[in-house]
Amino acid sequence: MFSYYFQGLALGAAMILPLGPQNAFVMNQGIRRQYHIMIALLCAISDLVLICAGIFGGSALLMQSPWLLALVTWGGVAFLLWYGFGAFKTAMSSNIELASAEVLKQGRWKIIATMLAVTWLNPHVYLDTFVVLGSLGGQLDVEPKRWFALGTISASFLWFFGLAILAAWLAPRLRTAKSQRIINLVVGCVMWFIALQLARDGIAHAQALFS
């Protein structure tokens, strides 16, 4: 059964490693050393829920509901554009240290709300967990399916906690004005690039839906 665990671990790692909204947010919280362990835990728990839903049957709901998929897609586009705009605004600030200090004043609940939006409004999360993991894990018998799910969940926990701790450890180097400007520019570009990709997919999906 361990072979199924390592298959899930490898696939989960491959899907979670690329820079996206969730990873960018965890990294930034680690650099700020602001509730970064709590955010890593909440991200991992969110992934746990999504992975279990996808592997144990939730994928059918998304695939059979084109309007739900469209709603998730365009909600994600709007959020990613807004998130990217915030990153660009911080990067272009004449006093980036002051802008970063203002971010540090955010309360715990606002940070949690942003984390939930970054996770649950990102359509790629549903495609990864419901479509990819759901199609692969759904073909397995009950016991192998559990080990496969455990492997993918382990990848999420290891990655988010590792990323948060590493970012906090490197914070003295990454918190400089130059580093913050570069990080925010990269995050803004990635968020807008993903948003444009999603918008293109959303338009194609809408054309197929109404044709």
UniProtKB/Swiss-Prot annotation:
What induces or represses expression of this protein, per its UniProt record? Transcriptionally regulated by ArgP. Lysine has a negative effect on the expression of argO.
Q: Which UniProt keywords apply?
A: Amino-acid transport, Cell inner membrane, Cell membrane, Membrane, Transmembrane, Transmembrane helix, Transport
Where does the sequence pass through the membrane?
A: 1-21, 37-57, 68-88, 111-131, 147-167, 182-202
GO CC list: plasma membrane
Q: Does the keyword Transcription regulation apply?
A: no
Q: What is its main location?
A: membrane
Membrane-topology annotation of the record: Multi-pass membrane protein
Pfam families noted in UniProt = LysE
Signal peptide residue numbers: none
Q: Where is the protein situated, by its record's location annotation?
A: Cell inner membrane
Q: Is Transmembrane helix set as a keyword in this record?
A: yes
This entry's Gene Ontology molecular function terms read: L-arginine transmembrane transporter activity
Show the catalytic activity: L-arginine(in) = L-arginine(out)
Family, as annotated = Belongs to the LysE/ArgO transporter (TC 2.A.75) family.
User: What role does it play?
Assistant: Involved in the export of arginine. Important to control the intracellular level of arginine and the correct balance between arginine and lysine.
* Protein name as it appears in the record: Arginine exporter protein ArgO
Q: Which gene encodes it?
A: argO
